[in-house]
Swiss-Prot record:
GO terms, biological process: translation
Species this protein is from: Pyrobaculum arsenaticum (strain DSM 13514 / JCM 11321 / PZ6)
Gene assigned in the entry: rpl39e
Family, similarity comment: Belongs to the eukaryotic ribosomal protein eL39 family.
An example Gene Ontology molecular-function term: structural constituent of ribosome
Record protein name field: Large ribosomal subunit protein eL39
GO cellular component, one term: ribosome
Claim: Nucleus is one of the keywords in the record: no
UniProt keyword annotations, A-Z: Ribonucleoprotein, Ribosomal protein
Cited PROSITE patterns: RIBOSOMAL_L39E
Amino acid sequence: MARNKPLGKKLRLGAALKSNRNPPVWVVAKTKRRVTRSPTRRHWRRVKLKA
């Protein structure tokens, strides 16, 4: 990908990077492991973004 990106695309990629995280440990502890993984997790090679 080009180093010089449009600002809108850069913001969308940054938001996707931040949202691609595990739930915090305190959430897993508070829900007694009922919530262990995020339904919105995305693997960089399997699922591509429409950014």
